[in-house]
Amino acid sequence: MTQYMDFEKPLAEIEGKAEELRALARANEEMDVTDEASALDAKARKMLEELYGALTPWRKCQVARHPERPHCQDYINALFTDYTPLAGDRNFADDHAILGGLARLQDRPVMVIGHEKGNDTKSRIERNFGMARPEGYRKAIRLMEMADRFNLPVVTLVDTPGAYPGKGAEERGQSEAIARSTEKCLQIGVPLVSVVIGEGGSGGAVAFATANRVAMLEHSVYSVISPEGCASILWKDAEKMREAAEALRLTAQDLKQLGVIDRIIPEPLGGAHRHKETTIASVGAALGEMIAELSAMDRAALITERRNKFLELGSKGLAA
């Protein structure tokens, strides 16, 4: 059953009524509710088009965080074959917020790395809600180095509210680990492609998304800070998150316009959480296209292009 967000309450009522009619028809075979149910379905679709055609930045944040949205493990299971998970940073521990391993994408050997939030209470706690600790970023560095050594393209799937800010993580060098992961992204001489599949939160996302090609799902978000965190700092009031979301320019559409990302992957009507298989297939197609485009480039060209891409960010605005 779909979990509805607050702005979808009118939609929930309509779809609920349609389901009630169908339940009555199933209980009584002589009852024909086809016309009534179809009318409600048409009304619900029209409302979906209106709601998702005019999503505010804050509502996009809500969609990006939807618990039923496909997560990293869903993409790995559906898109990659021969997946062999690799664990540990060879220094402290294995961070379960970060998945990674060898796999094949459309029969091409790759290294896949991503944030995993979990899909129920137990797994969310185990995955730390997708907030990686230093050992997670050091694991990612190890996997990127391995990919570079064996000339494997790297695919990163970004979905995190941010790196974990706990005391232990800070003591073990969280900021250094994020910086080293970002540095490693800039150093490897293989194609590096990244997709923001949900939340792209702060340095925790940048550490994976400093890539040759960066894509975002249509209703995902990518920002230096969460709207709630921004509101708490600027207005001393987390309830100002709507205003903060507007100011942060965190939507895929804004970031494409600003040149921060390279492409937007469309989501089906109603968001990825309503149509998981279609969304996952779209991401797979985009990944294949981006890797194929980059595979013709040699090591030096890949590194130079990636480095220049990020050094030039903001140059148009500064020049103006």
UniProtKB/Swiss-Prot annotation:
One cellular component (GO) term of this entry: acetyl-CoA carboxylase complex
CoA carboxyltransferase C-terminal domain span: 39-293
Location of the protein in the cell: Cytoplasm
Pathway named in the protein's UniProt entry: Lipid metabolism; malonyl-CoA biosynthesis; malonyl-CoA from acetyl-CoA: step 1/1
Alphabetized UniProt keyword annotations: ATP-binding, Cytoplasm, Fatty acid biosynthesis, Fatty acid metabolism, Lipid biosynthesis, Lipid metabolism, Nucleotide-binding, Transferase
Cross-referenced HAMAP family: AcetylCoA_CT_alpha
Record-stated family: Belongs to the AccA family.
Protein's UniProt name: Acetyl-coenzyme A carboxylase carboxyl transferase subunit alpha
